[in-house]
Amino acid sequence: MSMVEEAILVNGKKIVDAQRNYFNTGVTKSYDFRLKQLKLLKAAVEKHEKQIVDALYADLRKPALEAYATEHTITLADLDLAISNLSSWMKPERVPTPLFFMPGKSRIHSEPYGVTLTIAPWNYPFKNLIAPVIGALCAGNTMVLKPSELAPATSKAITDMVSEFFEPQYMTVVEGGVKETQELLDQEWDFIMFTGGTEIGRIIYQAAAKNLTPVALELGGKSPCIVDSDVNLEVAAKRICWGKFTNTGQICIAPDYIYVQKDIKAKFIELVKKNITEFFGADPKQSPDFGRIISNRHFNRIKNLIDGDVIVGGQTDESQKYIAPTVIDNVTPESKVMQEEIFGPIMPIMEYNTIDEVIGHINAGSKPLALYIFSNSSSFSDKIVTETSSGAVLINDVLVHAGHPHLPFGGVGNSGMGAYNGRISFDTYSHRKGVLTRSFMFDVKQRYAPATEKNTNFLKFAIRKLIG
C-alpha cells in the first residue's frame, strides 16, 4: 500500500470514528438539537444561494430557472416542511394492542441508525444530496456527504456550505472520485443512501452487505411514456418535451421512450417539433435554456445512440459537449437506442395498436424508476398501473412527482430499493423499533411449565381468538 492510499484510508476511518463517538454521546437525538440543525441547514442553503446556482451553471450549464425550480428552492421547501413537521414525525406511533397482550400498550419508536453515508449523482448534484440528508438529520443521525466529482463546482459549493455551518463530527463532506468513494465504502456504516446508476448501485450494495448495513438505492432504467388516443395531445406533447429535454435529458426519471397510439403519432410528432422550437429556438445550441452533457465520456455514449430515422436534431459538437434535442421515429424494441437508458436529449418514438402490446414490452424488461401515462381514460390508466411494476406512476404529467413531499420517491427491482421525500425520508433513515409495555396484572399461569394438555388447549384457543 502506498503512502497516498494509506493516508486516504486513515483519513476515512478517522472521519467515521469521530462521527460514531459524537453519535454515541446521544446529543443528536433530542428534538431541540435536530430542530436547531434543520434551521442551520436552511440558513446555509439561503446564504450560499448564489454560489450554488452559479455552480450548477458551471457544471451543467443549468439555467437559473431550472436551478431554482429543481435544486435550490425545492430544497428550501423540503426544509420548511421538515421544520414544521419534525415534532410529529418524532412522536412514537401508537398501534393497536390485541386482547392477548392486554393490559398493555403498543408503540413504534423511530430511532436513528447512527453514522450515515449519502452518495449523490452529478445530474442533480445539490438536490439529490441535500434532500436525503434532510431526512438523515431529522432522524437524529450523523452524516457524511459524498458529492459527485463530475460536478466539481457544486461539490465545492456544498463543501463550503457544510464546513461553514456544521462541525465535522456531526456533518461533513468528502470530495473526490472513485478512490475516495471506495475508501468510504470500506468503512463500517450504519446506513448508506446512494443515488446513481444501477451498476454502481450493485457495488454499493455488495460493500454494504459485508457489514449487513441497510441501504437505500435510487437507481434508474428506461422509464416509458405512453400516450393514449383519448388525450389532450397539445398539453401532453408540451409536457413530454419539457420532461425529456430538461437538464439535457440527464434525469433518472426522464421519459426515456415514447409509446404513441398509431392514429395520433403524426400529430404528436408535429407538436413535438413545434415545442422544441418554442422552447429552444431555431438553433438550440445558442439557447440559454438548453444545457450541455456532463462529460466527454457521456457525450460519446449518447452520440452513439443517435441512429435510425432521425426527424429532429441529431447535431453534435464535442468541443461544447452539445447534443441537440433529437427525435427518432419508427423505433422498435430492437433499435440501438432501446438497449440502454439514454440519459440524454434523445426522444425515441414507437407506435402501438393495443395497450396489451405495450404492457407486454414493459414487463419483458427491467422495472423502471417511473412510468408515465397520458390519457383521459381512467380505465386505460388503471390497467397499466395494475399490470405493470415501476417505482412510481405519473398520469398526465412527467417528472413533477419527484417533488411531492407525501409520495415515496424510489425504485423497485433494478431501479432501486427504499425511498425518500418528506416524512418518508425520516422513516428511511430511522430504525422503527417496536415497544410493548405489559402490566403485572393478569399473569396467565397456563404459559408456564409444566405443560399439560389442558394448558396447551387453552393457549391454542387464546392465541387464535385473541391475536388473530
Language-model regions, residue ranges each:
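N-terminal Rossmann-like NAD(P)+-binding subdomain of aldehyde/semialdehyde dehydrogenases
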Residues: 1-107
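ALDH superfamily catalytic-core signature
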Residues: 2, 6, 199-332, 355-356, ...
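Conserved C-terminal structural/oligomerization subdomain of aldehyde/semialdehyde dehydrogenase
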Residues: 2-3, 21, 30, 226, ...
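Residues at or immediately preceding the N-termini of alpha-helices
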Residues: 12, 31, 49, 233, ...
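Structural signal for hydrophobic packing residues in well-ordered secondary-structure cores
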Residues: 27, 42-45, 49, 60, ...
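Residue-level signal for inorganic ion chemistry
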Residues: 34, 79, 140, 171, ...
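Rossmann-like NAD(P) dinucleotide-binding subdomain of oxidoreductase/dehydrogenase enzymes
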Residues: 99-235
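Hydrophobic packing residues within well-ordered alpha-helices of enzyme cores
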Residues: 155-158, 184, 204, 268, ...
